[in-house]
């Protein structure tokens, strides 16, 4: 198993040009984000889309772009586990945990039901529903890694990442005002923001725009949603496998549990046991963020902008409906919990 995780020298040489281009795009996106405030994920995706010609067959960069979009992506998701610990659950309380967990499950079920109304398949429903329910772009990339591939897989992933990133940015501005309108306390505002906004960075921005208590609570709630990524991906993988829909190469069945999910769970367990020093956990979080940023740049490079626009209005309506559903559910839940 370990040997399969370590790229051969030939693979490294073939992949380096494409990886280097993806890393350069990611660094550029981060620079622009730091200086102009736009989300780095969104910028990396848009810059990548403009460089689609680098992924065309026969180019030196194509193999590395494909490698980065797949393998580096999985590494980034696995490293997210180092930020998760069981202590987070105890700090929040059972009522809020139940509300967050129910929001994740019901949003995914809503996506599966609503997708039929707009003529979208179950793959697209799991991709968009999971990304809205859990952690935006990171969840979209993790879920895409276990879904059976088809000719529109890359297009659907780019659409989902683009949509949840834009919606997260809008929510970062709008949702704190809604929290004030609903009369939420600082703690409830944090639960609302952390339980509804898609991406971690926008959750932090929205929470601390209200105050320190709201910001800390929002971040904690968001990380608990992130901790549900591995169980949800595992459930998706098991369901797909049970129905005989999983991808297979050379007639060999795919692994029951993807390696990156195992990595996520192992790191989360080690962190829960206090075996991961705070400095290492912080470093793993930074490495994860950069790996995901580089991977989404590669996904953008791989995707044709023309094909992405073929996704249709039904897909846009679906992801908007999922976002509204989650926000309404958490709002009602907070009022019920009092």
UniProtKB/Swiss-Prot annotation:
Membrane topology: Multi-pass membrane protein
Transmembrane segments: 12-31, 36-55, 75-92, 96-118, 125-147, 162-184, 191-213, 223-245, 258-280, 315-337
Main location: membrane
GO cellular component: plasma membrane
Location relative to the cell: Cell membrane
Domain of life per record: Bacteria
InterPro entries: UPF0324_pro
Alphabetical keyword list: Cell membrane, Membrane, Transmembrane, Transmembrane helix
Family: Belongs to the UPF0324 family.
Name assigned to this protein: UPF0324 membrane protein TauZ
């Amino acid at each position: 198993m370990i040997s399969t995780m370590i790229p051969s020298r030939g693979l490294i040489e073939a992949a380096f040009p494409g990886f280097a281009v993806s890393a350069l795009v990611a660094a550029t996106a981060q620079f622009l984000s730091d200086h102009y405030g736009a989300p780095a994920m969104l910028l990396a995706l848009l810059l990548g889309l403009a460089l689609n010609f680098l992924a065309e067959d026969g180019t030196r960069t194509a193999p590395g772009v494909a490698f980065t979009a797949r393998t580096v992506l999985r590494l980034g998701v696995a490293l997210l586990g180092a930020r998760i610990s069981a202590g987070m659950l105890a700090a929040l309380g059972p009522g809020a945990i139940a509300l967050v967990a129910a929001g994740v499950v019901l949003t995914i079920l809503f996506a599966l039901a609503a997708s039929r109304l707009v003529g979208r398949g179950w793959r697209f429903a799991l991709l968009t529903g999971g990304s809205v329910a859990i952690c935006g772009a990171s969840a979209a990339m993790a879920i895409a890694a276990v879904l059976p591939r088809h000719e529109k897989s890359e297009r659907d992933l780019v659409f989902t990442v683009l949509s949840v990133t834009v919606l997260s940015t809008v929510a970062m501005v709008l949702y704190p005002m809604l929290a004030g309108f609903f009369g939420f306390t600082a703690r409830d505002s944090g639960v609302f923001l952390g339980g509804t906004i898609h991406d971690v960075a926008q959750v932090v921005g929205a929470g601390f725009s209200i105050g320190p208590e709201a910001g800390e609570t929002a971040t904690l709630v968001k990380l608990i949603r992130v901790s549900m990524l591995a169980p949800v991906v595992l459930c998706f993988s098991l369901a797909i496998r049970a129905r005989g829909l999983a991808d297979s190469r050379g007639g060999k069945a795919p692994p029951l549990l993807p390696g990156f999910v195992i990595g996520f769970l192992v790191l989360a367990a080690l962190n829960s046991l206090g075996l991961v020093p705070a400095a290492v956990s912080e470093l793993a979080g930074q490495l994860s963020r950069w790996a995901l940023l580089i991977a989404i740049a590669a996904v953008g490079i791989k995707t044709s902008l023309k094909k992405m626009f073929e996704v249709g209005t039904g897909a846009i309506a679906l992801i908007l409906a999922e976002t509204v559903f989650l926000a309404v559910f958490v709002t009602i839940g907070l009022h019920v919990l009092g």
